[in-house]
């Protein structure tokens, strides 16, 4: 999100001019190849900059008065939508309306230091579960209604060796025991489905059935037919496996 020079209100979204030399060829490449522009919006850090109760509700998808965008006439009820739409506005301003926005990272820490407001299990659960519900509803964002934004959650596990503040180490959705750090709404059957698979049962191999040996009787050609018949090509034992392998590879492709 640091590539944006402006993001509030979302309609004012614009990239930093000093990054044009790097961004312009990148965006042109994404447009040419039909690839998305990946961003990492974190409402948690927006709340750190403005730790008011109404901001927390806005960041957690909880009921709030909404924030009107005078530039677009739209009203926003979540920081996530506002951040995504600010990137959308920046892309549109550059002329890249065909480049999709994908959220490569977002999340909320379940714990933090005394100076890190909002880093708690309750808030992390609210953010992730409400985000999942919001995405599944397919309501979209005010600027991009009717479709869900592809979103990747950060992170699977905590990073206890990561330097920095305590919150930076505490974004994990799961414990190393394969249990959820808190209910997220992501699992169909809770965490039971994450248990290690049981070892497969190996049955003793049965002996192959005996194949009766049959000696074919070859007809004896007459002298005349033997003299006139064209030579027949009989595939050798070495040729047969090659044919079977070729058929097998073709079937795989």
Regions found by a protein language model. Give the residues of each.
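Catalytic metal-binding/acid-base residues of hydrolase active sites
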Residues: 107
């Amino acid at each position: 999100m640091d590539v944006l020079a402006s993001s509030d209100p979302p309609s004012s979204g614009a990239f930093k001019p000093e990054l044009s030399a790097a961004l312009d060829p990148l965006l042109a490449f994404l447009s040419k190849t039909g690839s998305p522009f990946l961003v990492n919006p974190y409402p948690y850090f927006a709340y750190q900059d403005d730790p008011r109760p109404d901001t927390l509700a806005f960041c957690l998808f909880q009921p709030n008065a909404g924030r009107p965008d005078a530039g677009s006439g739209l009203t926003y009820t979540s920081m996530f939508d506002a951040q995504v739409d600010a990137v959308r506005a920046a892309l549109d301003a550059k002329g890249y309306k065909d480049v999709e926005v994908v959220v490569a990272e977002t999340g909320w820490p379940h714990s933090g230091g005394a100076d890190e407001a909002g880093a708690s299990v309750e808030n992390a659960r609210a953010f992730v579960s409400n985000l999942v519900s919001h995405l599944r509803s397919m309501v979209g964002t005010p600027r991009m209604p009717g479709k869900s934004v592809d979103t990747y959650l950060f992170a699977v596990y905590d990073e206890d060796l990561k330097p920095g503040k305590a919150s930076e180490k505490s974004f994990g959705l799961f414990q190393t025991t394969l249990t959820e750090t808190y209910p997220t709404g992501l699992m169909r059957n809770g965490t039971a489905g994450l248990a290690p698979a049981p070892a497969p049962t190996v049955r003793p191999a049965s002996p192959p059935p005996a194949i009766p040996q049959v000696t074919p009787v070859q007809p004896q050609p007459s002298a005349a037919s033997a003299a006139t018949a064209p030579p027949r090509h009989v595939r050798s034992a070495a040729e047969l496996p090659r044919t079977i392998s070729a058929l097998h590879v073709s079937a795989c492709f």
